[in-house]
């Protein structure tokens, strides 16, 4: 079966593994998924990210993060810009997720950035997802 939206699939796999309290998640690799995983690690939503080379496209191993009492660090993931309806925002209109408690992941001319980084670099772009 052909996957029409690999980013939505990646976010759904993270959401499902998080809801099931899994420690580790493995997904087929792509450059944009690597970028999203690195942003999630940098922003503290996941513990660690590993990239495993194989005969094909590679695998991304994501280590999910939980609090001391088992509470979930990622409470929500939402795909914003979809293949059928792209969502672009100018630098003045960049969204704030939960008044700054969450992040928006954007694809910009500077690469994949969070909403805060895009404001600092003064660039807009395609809103990929919200994470909170």
UniProtKB/Swiss-Prot annotation:
Belongs to the universal ribosomal protein uS8 family. Keywords: Ribonucleoprotein, Ribosomal protein, RNA-binding, rRNA-binding. This is Small ribosomal subunit protein uS8. Part of the 30S ribosomal subunit. Contacts proteins S5 and S12. PROSITE patterns: RIBOSOMAL_S8 (PS00053). Pfam families: Ribosomal_S8. It comes from Streptococcus gordonii (strain Challis / ATCC 35105 / BCRC 15272 / CH1 / DL1 / V288). One of the primary rRNA binding proteins, it binds directly to 16S rRNA central domain where it helps coordinate assembly of the platform of the 30S subunit. InterPro entries: Ribosomal_uS8 (IPR000630), Ribosomal_uS8_CS (IPR047863), Ribosomal_uS8_sf (IPR035987). Coiled coil: none annotated.
